[in-house]
Curated annotation (Swiss-Prot):
InterPro entries linked to this entry: RNaseH-like_sf, YqgF, YqgF/RNaseH-like_dom, YqgF/RNaseH-like_dom_sf
GO CC annotation terms, alphabetical: cytosol
Superkingdom of the source species: Bacteria
Protein name: Putative pre-16S rRNA nuclease
Amino acid sequence: MERVAALGLDIGKKRVGVAGCDGTGLIATGLTTIIRSSFVADIPQFEAIVKERNIKILVAGLPYTMAGELGFQAQQVQKYAQKLAIALDLPLEYIDERCTSLEAEEFLKAKKQFSSWDKGAIDREAAAIILQQWLDRRRRVNTVV
């Protein structure tokens, strides 16, 4: 079985939630939240994670509108994700992330780990949900012969 080295990203205006997965590609886990300042200042933080985890692909959540269209926010996410993929020299895939932040918040509340002050926890959990969806889809595609 090939090793999976993917990084899940929940890209927002102020923060980027980051998630990684185990080498088997079964379980995604929130890793950290990067506070965005400038793109140039953000890059070294991503480079360190990519190097440490030997990342081979980026998976970014794309916030489609409820009508399934690419709105302004989705276009901004695409712009940032594409620049990031180029800067890190990694391939990039997208996952529909409608409602992942809400799902992440509900999950953290259920675990009694929710704090309205810790927005970074929601971003990390949303990134884990995004990456888990990608891992699950990848597994389904690879098992269908």
